[in-house]
Amino acid sequence: MVGVNGERGRRWRVVVLALAAVYFLLPLFAAAEFSLRAPGGGHGLANWVAIARDPVLIGALLTSLQIAVITAVLVLVLVVPTAVWVRLRLPGLAGVMESVTILPIVIPPVVMAAGIAFVQANLGGPVFRALFASSTTALTPFYVVLALPFAYRAVDNGLAAIPLRTLVEAARNLGASTATALLRVVLPAIRSAVLGAAFLTLALVLGEIVIARILLYTDTFPVAIVEVGRSTAGVAVALSLASLLITWALLLAVSFAGNRRSRSGGSG
């Protein structure tokens, strides 16, 4: 009886996995097929070639990647020391930090974008003019705010999985400063969590469109996809697939880096 139940359970798992694969992969195959349709009929790489030959699209992709990298660095600089400090010195504020960092999820991006647009239109001065002079300087601070909920929880979960206080106290007893303990002891121990937070930030920036669209910054990759889709749907679908492939490549890079670190730590 146990063997029959086990066999039945395995069959159900196979069925569920097959249905999940169809659910996720079928739309991707359909999108890939649509992106390969030629304007005159048949199939070809015309839509993908159009992306490679369009300097506006390439520039938008590079701009979004630049914003994503800067945002990820700023988020980690803010989140990692804060999360470590809260766990070590102010554990009573853990609930407050959870509530504060979740606010960007609670507040709709449209509301945030409307407030930013009001500031952009009504507040002058050299600081605000310099801030809104380009999409990189204008969007990066707000993307940092949007990424805080995801990055903070990823880093905080990583800290919860290690004996943080023991590691820091051991490093301090050996003569290391707080900064040295953070950089050379804590950070390597939570490298997978830090890489996960960076990946979530990159994925968010590469997909965010509301704030950029309302603030009229059209030189970002998500906005470029929408603009192209108005005239050439095939190119827009190819752009969406390219964005997905870039995100997957980043995820694989993060996973590879984390696994390599784990193997090297285990062998050492």
Per-region residue spans from a language model:
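Glycine/proline-centered hinge or cleavage motifs at structural transition points of membrane proteins
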Residues: 174-175, 188
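Membrane-helix/interface signature in polytopic inner-membrane proteins
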Residues: 156-167, 178
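A short amphipathic helical element positioned immediately N-terminal to and/or at the very start
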Residues: 43-53
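Short cytosolic juxtamembrane segments of multi-pass membrane proteins
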Residues: 257-268
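Extracytoplasmic catalytic/substrate-binding loops of multi-pass membrane glycan-assembly enzymes
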Residues: 41-45, 218-220
